[in-house]
Amino acid sequence: MKLLLRALATFVLLNGVDSVADESFQKCNVTGGPHGKEFDDSNATSRGLILRALRLCGVDFVDGIGVTIWDLSVEENAPFHGLDQNCRDVQLSPYEYITSVEFHSAKIDSETRVGFIRLLSQENKTYEIGKMSNRGKEGISECTAPEGYQLAGFYGRSEDKIFALGALWGPLPEKWPLQG
């Protein structure tokens, strides 16, 4: 019975949207390869967060990614992963939040890494970095936030580039303070 429960828990972690330690957060499947060191923004945020900005780094591939979040418990926090070069900072408009992600993986010098990301807000604004995969559906992952959720950060694997990436969804705030 214990073996069956362990196998089921492993399956849930590797497939579909799953809950993290704080049950108010959910994760999408990770896209990419096994290289680099693990990271997880779920420790850098809490319920009621507001996503204020994105930091997207890279040219032909995704070399770095970060978010700036504001929440009631830590005021402002900006977890960042990968290489902080060739970056574009995107300030979200007040009350804007990310509802959908698309990640493409690519194989370079025998390493699988993230080659392209697209983030879509509820205002139909699109934010992208990298180059789209030409491998068809293979290596492409899309995920939409559950109803009442928004992008809260990321998890995956990185060093001087992003090797694997998944979205972390957090609940929308009950009240939106003025953003400025």
UniProtKB/Swiss-Prot annotation:
Q: Where in the cell is it found?
A: Secreted; Host cytoplasm; Host nucleus
Q: Which domain of life is it from?
A: Eukaryota
Q: List the disulfide bonds.
A: none
Q: A Pfam family in this protein?
A: Jacalin
Q: Name one GO cellular component term.
A: extracellular region
Q: Where is this motif: RxLR-dEER?
A: 52-77
Q: The Jacalin-type lectin domain covers which part of the protein?
A: 25-171
For this UniProt entry, which residues form the secretion signal?
1-19
Q: What does its UniProt record remark on the domains?
A: The RxLR-dEER motif acts to carry the protein into the host cell cytoplasm through binding to cell surface phosphatidylinositol-3-phosphate.
Q: What name goes with this protein?
A: Secreted RxLR effector protein 19
According to its UniProt entry, this protein's organism is: Plasmopara viticola
